[in-house]
Regions:
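Bacterial Sec-dependent N-terminal signal peptides
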Residues: 1-25
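Metal-dependent phosphoester-hydrolase catalytic domains
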Residues: 22-28, 219-229, 237-356
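N-terminal, active-site-proximal structural segment of metallo-dependent hydrolase catalytic domains
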Residues: 22-118, 129-135, 139-141, 318-326, ...
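Active-site-proximal beta-strand/loop segments in catalytic clefts of secreted hydrolases
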Residues: 39-42, 104-106, 130-134, 146-147, ...
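Extracytoplasmic/secreted cell-surface and envelope-processing proteins
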Residues: 46-48, 110-113, 137-140, 196-199, ...
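Sec-exported extracytoplasmic/periplasmic mature domains
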Residues: 86-90, 108-121, 149, 215-225, ...
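Structured beta-strand-rich core segments of catalytic domains in phosphoester-bond hydrolases
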Residues: 100, 106-192
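Extracytoplasmic, non-cytosolic globular domains
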Residues: 130, 174-269
Length: 356
């Protein structure tokens, strides 16, 4: 029996304050579950400067830099990241946690190799899909998967370009197609352009990123109208911002969806005041998952993998315990001082469910 398959009685463990209202299940039937996650690893850099690249941030992450980024700090960061990832989505229903996990703010494939080899993740046997991005900060997106549950059939990297600024570059968007316990799915991992220069002034870049993501989705659903496509990433905008709601045609309530819409379960969480990162004492929810309608079981039959519930993973150990930023993410550096935290973002994840 798959480790995802458990009796309905375990479902009570899936609920907490950071849970969006779940779909309705029949207590007389049994179901199997799968977890999909996303985590911004906040500048997971090694200590080595690549002489063949000209990336802005890599000079900051060396022993001689102002950050004094040495092997001890690097391996400590890996330990922290592995600890978090090992716990994302873990429950009695899903003891193996995230079957697939999108990540961002990684320097290269080498740091992912080091991460998945960590003793805290060895039981998951995570495999990697990664492409180098042209981003001038030197950071990429990546995709981790447990081969016991997910099989990759294809992958492709898409570059975001701005016609009026040919020298500008950002992170590529990563499309991974495969089978989750035998069912075909597509995952798009994103890290949209930041708000540097001002939210309003930079919004056109995120709209362009949303247009690229939506074009990938549309190409997949044109080929297969029932394609299960999940877009996940740090979008650097909230669920209600135009780049997400309008460009992606996303809707936060299933009952409000019409033809052509996508479902964004993070919108309801955001409206409850829940976030994944803080800025000037307020919450943002930049880390999101947006799904095509084929993930919604309108008749609650759950004959195929369908959306069940979404969460922000914000356990207490991931938060500042005191001070000005109490309750907000416990990050690696604060005002240039190394504080040995985790990330400036909380991870997000959701559960998919289907009837046995």
């Amino acid at each position: 029996m798959s480790l995802f398959k458990y009796a309905f009685s375990t479902l009570l463990l899936l609920f907490c304050f950071t849970t969006l209202k779940a779909q309705t299940l029949n207590p007389d039937k049994s179901y199997e579950f799968a977890c999909v996650g996303f985590y911004n690893l906040e500048n997971l850099f090694d200590t080595i400067v690549d002489p063949d690249t000209n990336k802005i941030l890599q000079e900051d992450f060396t022993p001689k830099s102002s950050k004094q980024w040495d092997s001890k700090k690097y391996y400590g960061k890996l330990d922290n990241m592995a600890e978090v990832i090992s716990k994302i989505g873990v429950s009695k229903s899903v003891p193996q946690g995230a079957a697939v996990l999108g990540v961002c703010e990684i320097e290269n494939k080498s740091v992912l190799d080091d991460l998945v080899a960590h003793e805290k993740l060895q039981d998951k046997n995570y495999q990697i899909v990664h492409y180098d991005s042209p981003d001038k900060r030197g950071i990429d997106v990546g995709f981790l998967y447990q081969p016991k549950y997910f099989t990759v059939t294809s992958s492709k990297s898409f570059t975001l370009k701005l016609p009026d600024n040919p020298n500008w570059a950002t992170r590529d968007q990563l499309l991974v197609t495969g089978e989750l316990n035998g069912q075909k799915m597509h995952f798009i991992v994103c890290h949209w352009p930041s708000r540097r220069g001002g939210q309003k002034e930079s919004s056109y870049k995120r709209v362009a990123a949303g247009e690229l993501a939506k074009s990938i989705v549309d190409s997949l659903t044109k080929e297969d109208p029932l394609a299960k496509v999940l877009v996940m990433g740090d979008l650097n905008d909230d669920p209600v911002d135009p780049s997400v709601r309008e460009t992606m045609n996303s809707v936060g309530e299933i009952e409000n969806m019409v033809t052509g819409d996508m479902f964004n379960p993070m919108e309801s969480l955001f409206k409850l005041g829940i976030g994944t990162l803080g800025y000037k004492g307020a919450w943002n929810l930049f880390d999101q998952m947006v799904l095509t309608p084929s993930f919604i079981s309108l008749d609650n039959s759950f004959s195929t993998y369908s959306y069940f519930t979404a969460k922000v993973f914000n356990n207490s150990f991931l938060k500042n315990s005191s001070g000005k930023f109490e309750g907000f993410p416990f990050r690696t550096y604060s005002y240039g001082k190394f504080i040995n935290g985790y990330s400036d973002h909380f991870p997000v994840y959701l559960y998919l469910v289907k009837q046995k």
